[in-house]
Amino acid sequence: MERAIFAGGCFWCMVQPFEEQAGILSVRSGYTGGHLPNPSYEQVCAKTTGHTEAVEIIFDPKQIAYKDLVELYWAQTDPTDAFGQFEDRGDNYRPVIYYTTERQKEIAEQSKANLQASGRFDQPIVTTIEPAEPFYLAEDYHQGFYKKNPKRYAQSSAIRHQFLEENWS
């Protein structure tokens, strides 16, 4: 089994696309990249911890390749926005691919270069690629949010889905 960590704005919106793929064993919402151990949602939202909202994915590389996860990640984000994603603004929502191995780093960097060269976007691809840091699990009410609160999830993800439809379909 391997581990992947992606930050792409609100973690509620990052779970379902990965969870629906064959070879995914778990997708958990949490916080990473900051300086405060075991932060709470309120602390991360206060923008003083340095953490981003992210998802940790445990996957079987025999069933789904890391490269495919990176491609799926791009299609969930606006890779030209370094200051958050969609209606969620600030460092705690910035887009980051966290790599856990040098091979993941190489794959992510090549994928980013390919996306930039594709001309899909008029602006530079600004998503950062950074070494993984400790991942702190978010509170239970955040886990599987799209299943627990489908109406609220639909409302909170509407702007994201419109962008994805216009730019990734």
Swiss-Prot record:
GO molecular function, one term: L-methionine:thioredoxin-disulfide S-oxidoreductase activity
Keyword Oxidoreductase: yes
Alphabetical UniProt keywords: Oxidoreductase
SUPFAM superfamilies, per the entry: Peptide methionine sulfoxide reductase (SSF55068)
Active site, per annotation: C10
Residues forming coiled coils: none
Enzyme Commission code(s) on record: 1.8.4.11
InterPro entries: Met_Sox_Rdtase_MsrA_dom (IPR002569), Met_Sox_Rdtase_MsrA_sf (IPR036509)
GO biological process: protein modification process
Glycosyltransferase recorded as keyword: no
Reactions accelerated catalytically: L-methionyl-[protein] + [thioredoxin]-disulfide + H2O = L-methionyl-(S)-S-oxide-[protein] + [thioredoxin]-dithiol; [thioredoxin]-disulfide + L-methionine + H2O = L-methionine (S)-S-oxide + [thioredoxin]-dithiol
UniProt cross-references to Pfam families, sorted A to Z: PMSR
Function: Has an important function as a repair enzyme for proteins that have been inactivated by oxidation. Catalyzes the reversible oxidation-reduction of methionine sulfoxide in proteins to methionine.
Membership in a protein family: Belongs to the MsrA Met sulfoxide reductase family.
PANTHER family in alphabetical order: PEPTIDE METHIONINE SULFOXIDE REDUCTASE, PEPTIDE METHIONINE SULFOXIDE REDUCTASE MSRA 2
Protein name as it appears in the record: Peptide methionine sulfoxide reductase MsrA
